[in-house]
Amino acid sequence: MSFVSSKIFAITGGASGIGAATCRLLAKRGAATLCVGDLCSENMKLLEKDIKKINPDTKVHCTVLDVSSSSNVDEWIQDIITTFGDLHGAANIAGIAQGAGLRQAPTILEDDDQQWKKVFQVNLDGVLYSTRAQVRAMKEFSSTNPGDRSIVNVASIASMSHMPDVFAYGTSKAGCAYFTTFEVTLFALGYFSNIMGMLEGITRTPMLPRFVPSAKTQEEVEETYKKEGFSVIEADDVARTIVWLLSEDSRPVFGANINVGACMP
């Protein structure tokens, strides 16, 4: 995993959960700079302290970022290029949940336009805006500073599971997974970067309780999933695969959407 050392990475949704776990592991593996974009600034100072303890040589650049705004994303990536001079890899992890058990069947009648748009603006539009800006930056530097460059888009096992009660979330994640597979044509045509996807399972993060709003405790949330046959994994479990995909160790893999954690079809 030393192949991530001395490199510059951009991580959306990087201040907590899977994003923060990815940042910590990249720092441990010797990344030069971590550019964290997150809508919530609450955990940024804590992340900076954690990274400093893990690797004092890793720089952390935190930005309040709304991935549903293409101009906001473009400005963020341009600021990374202006400040640090390159971009070697990116992980697009930012996303929002949709609570289950809140709608009566047929649930499509109770999913209003605003809810649908909000989920898609973050979970799908945000991935498009981020990937586009990252590819643009990587293309600019590929001729003068060649080398392996990777983008990892985090979708979800919900993209291939039958969960009609949260179909806006599942459909947005299915779009993210398909977008990632489709965009790999950039790699196949001999361009500068590799784009891969992640389908993470039920992961113990601050966002997990939002999927089960009826649960009063974290234990109730996890018990709900266990009754449905899902195991609960840690954010670090997902981060290890993301960092592997960002490293040169994953060079033979491209266009894949890799499942991490248990999945029910």
Curated annotation (Swiss-Prot):
Residues that bind NADP(+): I18, D66, R132, Y169, K173, T205
Signal peptide: 1-20
GO molecular function, a single term: oxidoreductase activity
Keyword line: Alkaloid metabolism, NADP, Oxidoreductase, Signal
Recorded catalytic activity of this chain's protein: chanoclavine-I + NAD(+) = chanoclavine-I aldehyde + NADH + H(+)
Presence of the UniProt keyword Protein transport in the record: no
An example Gene Ontology biological process: indole alkaloid biosynthetic process
Pathway: Alkaloid biosynthesis; ergot alkaloid biosynthesis
Active site: Y169 (proton donor), K173 (lowers pka of active site tyr)
Enzyme Commission number(s): 1.1.1.332
Keyword NADP included in the entry's annotation: yes
InterPro entries on file: NAD(P)-bd_dom_sf (IPR036291), SDR_fam (IPR002347)
Superkingdom to which the source organism belongs: Eukaryota
Family classification: Belongs to the short-chain dehydrogenases/reductases (SDR) family.
PANTHER family with a match to the protein in the record: 3-OXOACYL-(ACYL-CARRIER-PROTEIN) REDUCTASE (AFU_ORTHOLOGUE AFUA_6G11210) (PTHR43180), DEHYDROGENASE_REDUCTASE FAMILY PROTEIN, PUTATIVE (AFU_ORTHOLOGUE AFUA_6G03520)-RELATED (PTHR43180:SF63)
Subunit field text: Homotetramer.
Function noted in UniProt: Chanoclavine-I dehydrogenase; part of the gene cluster that mediates the biosynthesis of fungal ergot alkaloid. DmaW catalyzes the first step of ergot alkaloid biosynthesis by condensing dimethylallyl diphosphate (DMAP) and tryptophan to form 4-dimethylallyl-L-tryptophan. The second step is catalyzed by the methyltransferase easF that methylates 4-dimethylallyl-L-tryptophan in the presence of S-adenosyl-L-methionine, resulting in the formation of 4-dimethylallyl-L-abrine.
The protein, known as: Chanoclavine-I dehydrogenase easD
Gene that this sequence comes from: easD
